[in-house]
């Protein structure tokens, strides 16, 4: 569930929570960060922590990409200051005794926002819309493929011969998605319990393709939720020895995911 800092403090002191994920989104929309002990979070990390500034300049495989002014071998790959946004604290039911808080990235001085950080880019866009008299509201409809194999199996097979969880188009098909309900039910309920207002899941237009729909909210909150939904789907799939992909087009022979 979404909880306040005071609620988190109580849960840490009572040992209901012992780990706090302090994270932000990289340029690929993935959660990156640290697992912080509850004690350290309460003592000082709730105010600030530090991440390497290369996190906004890596590729999909986490290799550093040359040519960036903000982060490079020449500049020594320094740290940026990450200040946890206490409005984003959530308890994560699918991870034992774990909470999450997203952070805003600042330069090492702790005062200047990292201009190219994902949350800052969105904050500036929202501010421009507000000046024009608009309040951006967003709702996520994520599509993804669910596979029978685990991530390890898929990797060891060099990402060939992937086996979707169903064998014919399952768009709106109840029987097809009933076979996948062990995964989808946990995903829906876990996200709902974490404070993300999930409306539904359904089959989509290809074998093994899933869709999850989330009720709209303000743009920044939805962007934060969108990242967490993807991460939760991957982690819950892993628990069930399955795998998911949100790739726009993982296979040229089947339809893509939006």
Regions found by a protein language model. Give the residues of each.
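Acidic, glycine-rich loop-and-beta core segments that form the ion-binding/anion-interacting portion
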Residues: 209, 214, 222-258
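Active-site-proximal loop/short-helix segments
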Residues: 147-164, 197-217, 248-258
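ATP/Mg2+-dependent ligation/transfer catalytic cores
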Residues: 1-200, 222, 228
